Structures are given as C-alpha cells and as structure tokens.
Amino acid sequence: MPKALIQTYGCTLNQADSDAMEAILKGRGIDVEREGSASDDNYDYVIINTCTVKTATEQRILERLKRLQKLGRRLIVTGCMASANEDKVLGAAPDSSLVTTSNTHRIADALSDISNGSRAVYDAYVKPEKQGHFRGEGSAIARIPISEGCLSSCSFCETKFARGPLNSFSSNVILRSIEMAIKGGAREIELTSQDTGAYGADRRTDIAELVHAASELDGDFRIRIGMLNPEHLHKYIDSLIDAYKSDNVYKFAHLPVQSGSDRVLRDMGRNYLVEEFEGMANELKSKIPEISIATDMIVGYPTESDPDFEMSMRLIERVGFSRINVSRFSKRPHAGASKLKQLKSEVVKQRCISMYRLSRRMEIGSLTKVVGERRTILLTERNADSITGRDQSYRQVALREPGFRVGEFVDVEIIGNTPACLIGRPVGTVNKIEQVSYFRS
C-alpha cells in the first residue's frame, strides 16, 4: 500500500484542508500519516501544506522543501505558498508538484500523475464546496471549513492573494458535515475559515444564522466559532449573542483588533475604529458574562509610532482579553505594507517584549480568577501525562487522573493554574457517551 506524509503549517483552515486531503487519499487506498513520526524515507509521497502569514514560518518551510528536494522525495506542495509564492517554492524544490488552495480536492489526481512519471500542477482557480472531515484517532475535535477567501484588503496580509475573494460554502453542506462528525464521535466542532465573520455575505446569510442552526443539531457537542474580523461583527452582533446562549456553543470570541490606534488601523486597511471595537467587546462581555475574548496584535507596523504602541497597550488593559496573540510585523511581498519604510528592528523588539509581558500578565489573571470554581469541561485530547479539555469559556483545563476518555464531559473543581492552562480535579462525570474505538488511549 502506498504511504503518504502530510505536514501542515499555519491556521486551523489549513488543518481542515489536510483533514480533507487525508480522507480523500485514504479513500483511494493510500496509507496516510500526519506531521511525521518517522524518517522521510518511509514515505512514497510527502505533502507539505504551507502557510504564508509570517516570514519566519515561510523560511522554515523553504528549508524543509530544500531538504526534501535534495533527498529526491516525491513532493507535493499545497497551501498558501503554492498559490501566492510559487516562485519561492520552485526555487527551493524545482521538482515539486503544486496543488493550490482551491484544488486540494484534486490531491489524489496529483499523486496519480506523479506515480505515472509526470509533475502535477493544479493551479486553476475554482470555487469548490469543501466539506469537513472528522479524523477521530484519539481526538474529539472536528474542523469544519465554512468559507474560503475574505472580503477585506488588509495591507499587512497576502492570504487573500492566496485564497481569493470570499467563497462561502452552502450551509446545508456545512450542517451535513457537522452531523456526520457528531455521529462519528466528534464532540468539539471548530468552524473555521480565513474570516468566519464574513461568512454568508455572498449568500445573504451570516455566521450567527449558521451557528444557531448548528447548535440545534442532535447530540452533546460544543461549537467553537473561529476568528471574527471586527469589521463585520456589528452587522449581526445581536443575533450572534442569541446564538451564544445555546449550551452547545463555547462562550468564546476571537476578535483580532491588530492595533489600538485608529490611525494605524486606517493604514492597515482595517475598517473599524478602536471605539467601535471596544464597544462591541464590552457588549459581548455585558450580555454574556462568562465569555472569554481573544485577540491578535501586530507590533511594529511601519507607521506605528510610540504613542500608537501605547494606545495598543492601554486597549489590552481596558478590554481584559483572555488571550493576546502578539506578532511582530512581517513584511510580505504581495501585501501593500511591504512597500513602506520599516521600523528599526531594535525598536520593534523592545515593543514586542513589553506587549508580551503585559499579555502574559493579563492571560494569567484571566486564569487565576476562576481557581476554586467548578466547571464542566469537554475532554478533547490526551497528552503524554494528562488529558486536557475545555470549559464553557474555552479555557484549557488539564487533568492528571487516569480513567477518563477523550469525548467525555466531566465536572471538575479548578484547583490551580499554570501560565497557559487551568488544572482541574474531577468531582463527577456528566453526559457520559458511548465510547468508540478510536477514543481508546
């Protein structure tokens, strides 16, 4: 039986694409491994699903491609670099085959071409109806893609160049994927896309309607809503708040503000003001008291001044985010900001250190405030020495007691925390589910 390795870099949408490619290849009788646990010599094909968001990640990918080219591996490159930076891919691995983001459904055809001695290239832009595929195999998480592309034109990002304009998938297809995943044993449903906040703008619907419909499906499960661009949130915030009230929906929102300065937001092409963002965040917290809000911040955007940076720091303090993903500005070749004069590296470095320290303090504070409380958590993944789950606010909780299985809902007392997660002690089990074979540890 032919054997393929799929290695994935980047976002949850990329992971969902890899899930789909894995399902397609297994359906064709190909043995598939993910991320690699053995030598590259053990695989007939190596599929690298790439990311183009950060320069550092891109450099790691290019080094990986160079090594595989040198080893003479039969290599397929997919993901955003295959779509946006084909020249860099071929510079590192001239013999590699290319499958762009909208053509991942052709992955089996690409392997067939290669086995017949041809170099495969599937790069025509198409608008597929992608489906979610639940892997199982020790996890209770199903990643369900709901759209591809976006409506925005952010000056720091070239992902739109890779994935194109917004293409929302049919809600019927999405709901069928969720139903199949739940029947297969999934308990956490991750709705993922480049921007879930834009979902449905091309279909006269929105993410709130989709979440509401999904939450009414049969079964015990939790829905995690993916990243929501604040630009779109005001259009449906009331109906989204109603959707959050379902027990089947995590009280969690990922709202990437990127800067606390209106001037920098304008330069970035972000179509909202800080006051508008803060108002929406406060409304969510007011009407859903248990909600946790995560955000992204870019440090060192070329036009960011010292006062602009301080505005970002103060915004973090005022909103009280549960998680802050701090990223140093990364110059991307197809993004408008790449043409701007860059800030001095030492200035950006010191700003990153300051924001990271503040972020860690805020994140730890959001964890310590729930120590001593009871929570019902969904166990989603088993690690080497613990099993971890999520509470209703999507905070990670680790248990060290044996005897529990992925997919169970467990009542715990929060007895402590690390800088990254809560530590729980079981006080009883609720909603025990019938175990299926791939949940066995």
Report residues per predicted region.
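Proteins enriched for Cys/Gly/acidic motifs involved in redox and nucleic-acid/cofactor modification
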Residues: 1-198, 253, 275-286, 310-318, ...
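Generic beta-strand/beta-sheet core signal
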Residues: 7, 192-194, 226, 256-258, ...
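Thr-Gly-centered strand-to-loop micro-motif
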Residues: 8, 324, 399-400
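Conserved SAM/AdoMet-binding glycine-rich loop
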Residues: 75-79, 84-85, 183-306, 317
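Glycine-centered loop/turn positions within well-structured domains
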Residues: 105, 152, 164, 197, ...
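Hydrophobic, well-ordered secondary-structure elements that form the walls
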Residues: 255, 296, 316, 324, ...
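Terminal RNA-binding accessory module
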Residues: 331, 338-441
